[in-house]
Structures are given as C-alpha cells and as structure tokens.
Amino acid sequence: PLDTERGYHIHFKGFEHLLSRPVVFANRGFGITPMEQGLRVVGTVEFGGLKNPLSKSRIKNLVNNAKYMLDGLPEHNDEWLGFRPTLPDFLPVIGNSKNYKNVFYSFGHHHLGWTLGAISGKIISKMISNEKTNLDLQPYSSLRFT
C-alpha cells in the first residue's frame, strides 16, 4: 500500500538576508530557511498521488503564513512539489523479503527519509551480517499489510 506524500515549498528570491538561520513557527505549522535561491518556506504535505496537479490552496497557505510573519515580502517566485514514499501507518518497511533471503527492504520513511535513512541503513547492514539489532523490527515488517 505504498502511497505518495507530497511536500511543498516556495521561494521569495532576494530576501534571504531577513533571516540568518532556519526558523520554525510551530504554532502556525511551517518553517522558513534562508538559502541561495531566497527564503524557502516549507510546511505542508498531503496524500495526492503522482499525477494530481499542485494544490494552489497549499501554496497560498505557505504564502500567507510567510507574509504574516515577515511583513513586506513580495510575491513568491518559485513553487515546488516533491514526492516521498509513504505507508498508511507512517512507519517504514525495514527487513528482509519473505521470498528472497538476499533481498532487504528499507523504504517508506515519508518526509523523514534523510533523517532515518542512516539508522535504517545500519539496521539493514546488521541484518545482512547476521548481527543482533536488539530491536523489535516486527512493526516495520513488510508483512504487516498482508
């Protein structure tokens, strides 16, 4: 049941000088990071598949939040939509194939792929080497959906 989580961001070019570091506005559910391309505003995801168009209402939400927090921003100049493999229970699949002993899975980390990739890789490397992990990997089994 692998699905597609779609994450959005926008840029305000030329205003990266307004912030010296990334800032998260937790009460409004978004963040802003100064980058070479300008201020990058992030903070919205959805399940929307691979073929549906970009959601203008999600972009508008990012724009409104950014302009509320940083008065005087112009119109944004870039909209982006990226895809992340996600499972319905938001847990990745980590483990070996039931059909092939030499096939191991590590996918479905949704928007935490960069964060959890190294940890999952270490677990998989221990599994390949037949080392104990001291972890209960049952919740991450690919068989949980059968």
Predicted features along the sequence, with ranges:
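Active-site substrate-recognition segment that forms the wall
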Residues: 1-101
